[in-house]
């Protein structure tokens, strides 16, 4: 989408908060442990390149992304440290990854064999991480025989450099550790089958790092924590206590573009789902579901000036309306999402309101909303 630079609606990102979150995690790492900063999905909506540069300054060993295009974006921005693509990349694109010094995830033996054909044609060597499905049910090796065969295939194979082996926890953010421990044991078992020697063995994500201890992992893939958000933040449940201080970095702000008084019997929005019962002051905000502010936020309270005001009527594609207790001027600041966790319109409150997680709220705020960076 085209960024709306001529519209008063922006996502603000405090790079100072990002920096402090990374520093806090770096101090929390075990001796000899390193950090990979996860900046997939445009840095969880915060801006991949800008976040990566801060992480690089603070000593991150490298980066994780979800798709090859995200890795190439970082390379174009002169990010030179290792980059791992966590998702499955089609084998035909393995040479592109190799040329750009990007590491790819190996999900199974078939992928290895297919990728080798493309790499051999161009006499290239690709850095790879062996993905293990220890219980996430997503991608990676989960059968002993296939994993053993993959190890044998890789022995003395010059088209691949085995940089890592990893898995992903499904429930490290839960206070019930039963399945978490099951995954640990599964990963430990698969590790015992290795005949090749990866440079890095890694299984820690943000939740595993800040809620658990004693996991032998060369790297921590620090994702949601970079952005100051607690990974245990599920709707209608209390957060687990983080071992490090987390400071939210993102806020979402706009302004009133129109203010009017409507009268008894007047409706607001498509379907007139709000009907005035008396004279009512309505303000219009130039943000809608096309920006990622979905229709389910009808009724949510945003801060207009110094007042918390309910969104009334259905949220439109490009605008929404609020009911105000007093007349305010066009241009009055509207804080849709606050980066202060004590405010009632913080990102967890926004996520809870629509029965989702704050990861999704941040990621949905799309490119039509310019990002404004500051350090405080």
From Swiss-Prot:
Substrate binds at residues 138, 317. Its cofactor is pyridoxal 5'-phosphate. SUPFAM superfamilies: Alanine racemase C-terminal domain-like (SSF50621), PLP-binding barrel (SSF51419). Keywords: Isomerase, Pyridoxal phosphate. The active site is at residues 40, 270. InterPro entries: Ala_racemase, Ala_racemase/Decarboxylase_C, Ala_racemase_C, Ala_racemase_N, Ala_racemase_pyridoxalP-BS, PLP-binding_barrel. Pathway: Amino-acid biosynthesis; D-alanine biosynthesis; D-alanine from L-alanine: step 1/1. One of its GO terms (molecular function) is pyridoxal phosphate binding. Pfam families: Ala_racemase_C, Ala_racemase_N. It catalyses: L-alanine = D-alanine. One of its GO terms (cellular component) is cytosol. Its EC number is 5.1.1.1. It is an enzyme of class 5 (isomerase). GO terms for biological process: D-alanine biosynthetic process; peptidoglycan biosynthetic process. Signal peptide: none annotated. SMART domains: Ala_racemase_C (SM01005). The modification N6-(pyridoxal phosphate)lysine is found at residue 40. Belongs to the alanine racemase family. PANTHER family: ALANINE RACEMASE (PTHR30511), ALANINE RACEMASE, CATABOLIC-RELATED (PTHR30511:SF0). Catalyzes the interconversion of L-alanine and D-alanine. May also act on other amino acids. NCBIfam families: alr. HAMAP family: Ala_racemase. This is Alanine racemase. It comes from Lactobacillus helveticus (strain DPC 4571). The lineage of its organism: Bacteria, Bacillati, Bacillota, Bacilli, Lactobacillales.
């Amino acid at each position: 989408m085209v960024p709306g630079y001529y519209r008063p609606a922006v996502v603000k990102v405090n790079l100072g908060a990002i920096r402090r979150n990374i520093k806090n995690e770096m101090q929390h790492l075990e001796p000899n442990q390193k950090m990979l900063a996860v900046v997939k999905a445009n840095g969880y909506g915060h801006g991949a390149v800008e976040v990566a540069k801060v992480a690089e300054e603070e000593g991150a060993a490298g980066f994780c992304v979800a798709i090859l295009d995200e890795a190439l974006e970082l390379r174009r921005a002169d990010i030179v440290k290792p980059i791992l693509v966590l998702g499955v990349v089609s084998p035909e694109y393995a040479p592109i990854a190799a040329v750009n010094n990007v590491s790819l995830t190996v999900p199974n033996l078939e992928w290895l064999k297919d990728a080798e054909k493309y790499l051999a044609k161009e006499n290239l060597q690709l850095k790879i991480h062996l993905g293990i499905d220890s219980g996430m049910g997503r991608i990676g090796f989960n059968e002993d025989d296939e994993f053993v065969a993959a190890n044998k295939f890789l022995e003395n194979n010059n088209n691949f450099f085995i940089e890592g082996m990893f898995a992903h926890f499904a429930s490290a953010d839960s206070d019930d550790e039963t399945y978490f421990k099951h995954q640990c044991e599964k990963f430990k078992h698969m590790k015992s089958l290795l005949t090749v020697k990866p440079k890095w063995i890694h299984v820690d994500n943000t939740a595993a790092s800040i809620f658990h201890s004693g996991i032998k992992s060369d790297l921590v893939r620090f994702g949601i924590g970079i952005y100051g958000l607690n990974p245990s933040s599920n709707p209608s449940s209390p957060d687990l206590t983080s071992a490090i201080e987390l400071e939210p970095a993102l806020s979402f702000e706009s302004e009133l573009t129109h203010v009017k008084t409507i009268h008894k019997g007047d409706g607001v929005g498509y379907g007139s789902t709000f009907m005035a019962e008396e004279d009512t002051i309505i303000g219009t905000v130039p943000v809608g579901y096309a920006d990622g502010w979905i229709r389910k936020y009808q009724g949510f309270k945003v801060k207009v000036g110094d007042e918390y005001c309910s969104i009334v009527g259905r949220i439109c594609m490009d605008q929404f309306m609020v009911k105000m207790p007093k007349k305010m001027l066009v241009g009055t600041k509207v804080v849709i999402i606050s980066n202060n966790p004590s405010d009632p319109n913080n990102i967890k409150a926004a996520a809870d309101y629509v029965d989702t997680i704050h990861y999704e709220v941040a990621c949905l705020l799309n490119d039509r909303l310019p990002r404004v960076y500051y350090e405080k």
